[in-house]
Every structure is written in structure tokens, then in C-alpha cells.
Amino acid sequence: MEAPLVSLDEEFEDIRPCCTEDPEEKPQSLYGTSPHHLEDPSLSELENFSSEIISFKSMEDLVNEFDEKLNVCFRNYNAKTENLAPVKNQLQIQEEEETLRDEEVWDALTDNYIPSLSEDWRDPNIEALNGNSSDTEIHEKEEEDEFIEKSENDSGINEEPLLTADQVIEEIEEMMQNSPDPEEEVEVLEEEDGGEISSQADSVLLQEMQALTQTFNNNWSYEGLRHMSGSELTELLDQVEGAIRDFSEELVHQLARRDELEFEKEVKNSFITVLIEVQNKQKEQRELMKKRRKEKGLSLQSSRIEKGNQMPLKRFSMEGISNILQSGIRQTFGSSGADRQYLNTVIPYEKKSSPPSVEDLQMLTNILFAMKEDNEKVPTLLTDYILKVLCPT
């Protein structure tokens, strides 16, 4: 079977306009240099390559000729190939670079491949081509890097050095001096003298702490204690023991004060809780009474209509007499056990310049709790509250 013929005219249609119209003229090289005869006889077979390109040849012939030309090209490694592939000089390279620099299409293609200064190209996770990411993605990545740096700074990577004991004591002293006491704002005028005395005691205690701290800084070292005499050591020991006693007493006082504040907080919370529960129950009772009153009015209206339709047989009946007696007993001796309620009891209260004390809140809490439970102790508790708080003897 014969090999198919290949027509090179169709494949080289784009090259034809570049050729000269005169067939006798020799073709010009790609770079504008005139061709020369090959000096090496081993390369003389390549001169007829351009003329043979136009002819019709089979695939087998083309492959064979290509192999022959390859063998000719690589036969002599010292052969000069400048005539086959002329080397550009520096001027031509510079002109081509300037031409590419002025091309808008080339600039549009190569702008996305410019490396960013903020990117670390040694990072294995970075993309192989920077052109794949748009300007928005690059901006988002820069913002993410800045956020990571801020989070690292906030997380304590650049932590400040730890404070010494002397610095901590100084900060505590400044806090105690600068922080106002919230209790002094709500204290009555009678307790102002006690507040002044306590503030003076605190200032004296602070002075003692400062003096003791200075002594510790000056003498509390191995060398300093070693060069001190026995009397000086004894005096320093007495100072330390006295400071320990004073600080222990102050600590006990502050702990007791903390317990008092916690107890006061619990009493206030319980008072507020019981008060809200009583108010909710009073609201429910009012709604229930309105509902009963409405139902009673409807029943009375219906009974009147029925009585108007019927003629009374007797002027008095046993049922009417019984109802009259029961209503009289209720008005005389009070309501029955089912209707006895202390939920709507009114507690007298006198508003003072100072808030109620813990004892007053405890008594009010007990009264409210008895009202919520509908306990019979409400009158007794209310009497005690009036005699002890409102009208003390």
C-alpha cells in the first residue's frame, strides 16, 4: 500500500506572502540577513531544503529526509551554524524588549505575574502562579495577614515581663488610695466620724507598709542581713512581727466585712424575690375577683328574669332565711376559713433619707412571706414591725 502524499502548499500558505515575487531571487532570512553558502561541506545538503519544501512528497520521504538532516546537523559538533540560525546581537535584543514594553497586550498579560512584596515565595503553601489570583484575593490575603499579626499580639506573644513583689505592692497602694469607697456615699451623717477614723487607720497602715517595704528593699538580702548586727536584726524582727499582726488583723476585718456584704446581698435578693411573688399573686387574685363578680352579676340577672316570670308562693322561705343568717355571721365574726386571706394586707412604710437596714429588710421579708403563704402570723409580724421600726419606744 502506497504512503499518502502530503501537500506542503496548504500548510505553508501563511509563509508564502513573506516570499519574494521573483522566483530567481534568493529567500531572505528571518532576521533580515542575507544567506551565505555553507562553508562546511558536511552541511551543503541543507542548501536545497527551502526549494524542496514546495514539492509533493510522501510521509515516508519526509521522515527520511528529516532524519538525514538531523544526522547532518549533529555530525560535526564543531561546525559553524551561524548561517542556519543567526545569533541576535545586543542591539536587536534591546529593540525587541523596548517593543514589548510598549505593547499594551503584553502588559495586560504579564501584570498578573508580578510577585507581591508581602508574599513569601519560600512558603510551600503559596500558589505556583500569582496570576491565578485576582487583585481582590490579594487584598483579602493581606488583610488576613494583618489580622493574624494583631491576634498574635493580643494573645500574649509579646507579653510584658512579670512584675516584682514591690511593684505589686505599689500598685495595690495606688488602687487603695485612688479607688473611692462606695459605702461612704450612702452612709448617714452619724457614721461619718467612724468613716474618717477608718480612713485614718487605712492611711496609717499604708504608711507602715511603705516603710516596711523600703526596709525590706534595703536589708532583705543575704549580704545585707549578714552585715547587720544582733540589735539591728532583733529590731527588724520586731518590725516584721508587728507588721504581720497588723496585716492579719486587717485581713480578718476585711474578711468579716466581706461576709457582712454577702449576707446583706442575700437578704436584699430574698426581699425582692418575695415581693415580686406577692405582687404576682395579688394580680391573679384581682383578675379572679373580677371574673367572679362578672359571673355573679350574670347569675343575678338571670335569676331576676326567672323570678319575674314566676309568682312567689310564699313571702318567706327557709332558704332565704338561711342565706340571711350566714351573711350576718360573716359580717359579725369575719369570713370563713376558705375566704380568709392576708394577701392584700397593707404594710405601712416610712421613707427615710437612708435605705432600710438589714434588720428592717428581714422583718419585711418575713411579713411578705407570711402574706404569700396566707399565714395567720401576718397580724403579729405586722404589729412587731410597727412597734420596732415605725414607732420605737
UniProtKB/Swiss-Prot annotation:
**Would you tell me the Gene Ontology cellular component terms?**
axon; cell projection; centrosome; cytoplasm; dendrite; Golgi apparatus; growth cone; microtubule
Name the tissues where it is expressed: Brain.
Q: Name one Pfam family in it.
A: FEZ
Protein's GO biological process: cellular response to growth factor stimulus; establishment of cell polarity; establishment of mitochondrion localization; hippocampus development; mitochondrion organization; negative regulation of autophagosome assembly; positive regulation of anterograde axonal transport of mitochondrion; positive regulation of neuron projection development
Mark the residues carrying the PTM Phosphoserine.
S58, S299, S317
Keywords, ordered alphabetically: Cell membrane, Coiled coil, Cytoplasm, Cytoskeleton, Membrane, Microtubule, Phosphoprotein, Transport, Ubl conjugation
Q: How is it modified after translation?
A: Phosphorylated by protein kinase C zeta; which enhances interaction with UBE4B and polyubiquitination.
Which residue intervals make up region (Disordered)? 1-41, 130-154
| InterPro entries listed in its UniProt record | FEZ
Residue ranges of coiled coil: 231-299
Q: Where in the cell is it found?
A: Cytoplasm, Cytoskeleton, Microtubule organizing center, Centrosome; Cell membrane
The GO terms describing molecular function are: gamma-tubulin binding; protein kinase C binding
Q: What is its biological role?
A: May be involved in axonal outgrowth as component of the network of molecules that regulate cellular morphology and axon guidance machinery. May participate in the transport of mitochondria and other cargos along microtubules.
Family from the record: Belongs to the zygin family.
Give the multimer and partner information: Homodimer. Interacts with UBE4B and SAP30L. Interacts with SCOC and ULK1; SCOC interferes with ULK1-binding to FEZ1. Directly interacts with SCOC and UVRAG. Stabilizes the interaction between SCOC and UVRAG during amino acid starvation. Interacts with the NH2-terminal variable region (V1) of PKC zeta and weakly with that of PKC epsilon.
Q: What name appears for this protein in its UniProt entry?
A: Fasciculation and elongation protein zeta-1
What lineage does the source organism belong to? Answer: Eukaryota, Metazoa, Chordata, Craniata, Vertebrata
Gene name per UniProt = Fez1
